[in-house]
């Protein structure tokens, strides 16, 4: 009887965990605008962005959401991130200028990373140390964006002199992963955010349309033609790239 009770409890806990996950399936479409005191020219390929969502899975090819040089698309599966990077032009340029690399491939590579959920446990704990940041989730402040209830969050970031550079973000709790590694671990999907680009320039991305159900499994497949390197080979390639770029900059 005790075993049956334990099994039933485990099933209920599992169901609770499943219910806690977001089940939204669709596309979040954004408009990117220059909103600073100094105007910026935003190319068409940047001005319109989108993220495809299927529960905890995200996929985007939009430049505004891609980190790292040469990134062409990012796939998120919960805490796992897979980036397709095209370094072919950079490698060709450096090789033309006399640089040599151990790596002999085309430059189209896959970079994988899996985050530890413990890394995000302290993100909403106040931390004012220089060089640190934390998230302040503001209770009671909401607004509607693209038909969704958006909740307020402020990212407090402290420079080396201890000065806070707050950034306000409005996000949905009903869309995307509970820990969104595409956006540094926030608890949902950003719907609006203004980013300081320096010298009076700023970019604001805002969700303008949320399309439900218009995604399929094939939308979350990586493109062909990319190779996966070992961790050591990937580390060596990036170290050599950094070294060669620094040498060119110093000339």
Segments and roles (model prediction):
Residues 1-23, 28:
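Bacterial Sec-dependent N-terminal signal peptides
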Residues 22-251:
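Extended soluble regions of mature proteins
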């Amino acid at each position: 009887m005790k075993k049956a009770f334990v099994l039933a409890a485990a099933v209920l806990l599992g169901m609770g965990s499943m219910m806690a996950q977001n089940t939204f399936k669709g596309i979040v479409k954004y408009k990117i605008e220059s909103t600073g005191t100094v105007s910026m020219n935003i190319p068409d390929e940047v001005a319109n962005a989108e993220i495809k969502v299927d529960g905890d899975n995200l996929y985007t090819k939009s430049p505004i959401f891609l980190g790292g040089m040469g990134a062409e698309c990012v796939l998120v599966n919960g805490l796992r991130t897979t980036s397709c990077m095209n370094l072919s032009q950079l490698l060709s340029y450096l090789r033309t200028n006399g640089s040599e690399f151990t790596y002999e491939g085309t430059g189209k590579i896959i970079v994988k990373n899996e985050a530890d959920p413990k890394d995000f446990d302290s993100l909403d704990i106040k931390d004012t140390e220089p060089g640190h940041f934390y998230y302040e989730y503001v209770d009671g402040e909401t607004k509607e964006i693209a038909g969704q209830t958006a909740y307020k969050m402020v990212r407090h970031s402290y420079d080396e002199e201890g000065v806070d550079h707050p950034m306000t973000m409005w996000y949905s709790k009903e869309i995307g992963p509970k820990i969104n590694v595409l956006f540094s671990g926030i608890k949902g999907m950003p719907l609006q955010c203004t980013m300081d680009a320096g010298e009076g320039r700023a970019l604001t991305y805002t969700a303008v349309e949320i399309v439900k159900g218009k995604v399929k499994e094939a939308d979350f497949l990586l493109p062909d033609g990319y190779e996966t390197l070992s961790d050591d080979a990937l580390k060596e390639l990036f170290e050599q790239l950094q070294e060669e770029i620094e040498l060119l900059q110093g000339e």
